[in-house]
Amino acid sequence: MDLVPGILHADLDAFYASVEQLLNPSLRGRPIAVGGGVVLACSYEAKAFGIHSGMPGRRARELCPDIIFTGGHFSEYQRLGDAAIAVMRDYTPDVERISIDEAFADVAGSRQLFGSPEDIARTVRRRVRTELGLPISVGVARTKHLAKIASQVAKPDGLVVVDPGTELEFLHNLPVELMWGVGPVTKAKFAEAGVMTIGQLAQRSPNSVQRLLGQAVGEKLSQLAWNRDPRAIETRRRARSAGAQSALGRRPATERVFKPVLLHLAERIATRLRAKDRPCRTVTVRVRFSDMRSVTRSLTLPASISATTPLMEVAVDLVRGVLADYREEKTISLLAISTSNLGQDSVLQLELPFGLADDGLRPGTRKGAARGRADRAMDVIRGRFGWESVAYASSALGEKHSVPDEFRSLAEKEL
């Protein structure tokens, strides 16, 4: 392994909120949140009051009566996220984007041209700040896992370089929840087992960690606790799934509420699938109730689809099934659709109607083909005149009541 820490992890700080403050300078230095019924993102000024993503808007207002909510400018998030990644690509072609606001870069081969990895990290930070007006934190290390942790330690708007010889000392003093893949559930399991720091995890035998978390997760985290991470930068990584979600606050669990939301989400996802010729076979929905419990349902289809209406219809059926199983739940706070089992270039082969039902879920039937043609016509119109230029009637009419609040736009951009 190279003794020079050549992996950068760059993460735009409080990205959505920072963009809103950039677009409206009067919001700078003030507690703001993107969203409405649910906080999708918030500024550091809001975080100081204990506000965080996923918190109900009402609770956020209780903690900070002066908080300012904004609806979000998702096209600007995409544009500025793309611009920040473009800055990184000025110094190396080896950039792996993992979300709309963060990416890895391997700059070990760029030293002769642009200086040390630390020099490159400082230059990236300066350019993003001066050219885009956004704060960005960067971690530099020999492995992806450690670079990502270093960027978290660097927040807000900082730089942390982990030199060889100091890696385990740096890593083992940190809380275990900073590890990639340790969420609230895993953190709670670790806490019950008396594991609070990465160093304490490292001292546990791999077998005991596997008994606690399962073989795959336990083995992975045991290795990462010792900074054993052989993963290289994946510059040509293709997404294995595409999804979108909508935070709703507290809405009645009725079809009148959820169907327009699912149609809007299906439009977003299906447009991306068609743009990259990557139809899906598996559709998953997630329903989160007002008590924050989540339920998922999946269906794998006999044929791949990329048309909006079939995707929406599958999602609606899955959500109906969830609500039928949880009749006591009267309100929902979030809906999500995820598509997976993505295919490669879709070639449509028409099916002969040998007395079979003309099933609109099958793209090769007359009904399915007609739906596909309608969607592609809408894609052309939107490509020329913008997203709002054309829409399904039920989506447009229901949008003012059920507009999805959040789309993790990387999937839209880089399927």
Predicted regions: what is each one?
Residues I98-E102, A141-K144, R278-T282, K330-L334:
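Short Gly/Ser/Thr- and Asp/Glu-enriched loop/turn motifs at secondary-structure junctions
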Residues H9, L171, L178, T186-I332, ...:
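DNA-contacting surface of Y-family translesion DNA polymerases
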Residues V285, I337, G386:
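Hydrophobic, well-ordered secondary-structure elements that form the walls
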Residues A14, G109, R142, F289-D291, ...:
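Non-catalytic surface loops within mature trypsin-like serine protease
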Residues I305-G383:
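C-terminal hydrophobic structural anchor segments
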Residues M1-W226, R231-I233, T271, D359-L415:
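Gly/Gly-Pro- and Ser/Thr-rich, intrinsically disordered tail segments characteristic of DNA damage-repair
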Residues V38, H73, S246, F289-D291, ...:
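A broadly conserved detector of short glycine/acidic/proline-rich loop/turn motifs that flank catalytic sites
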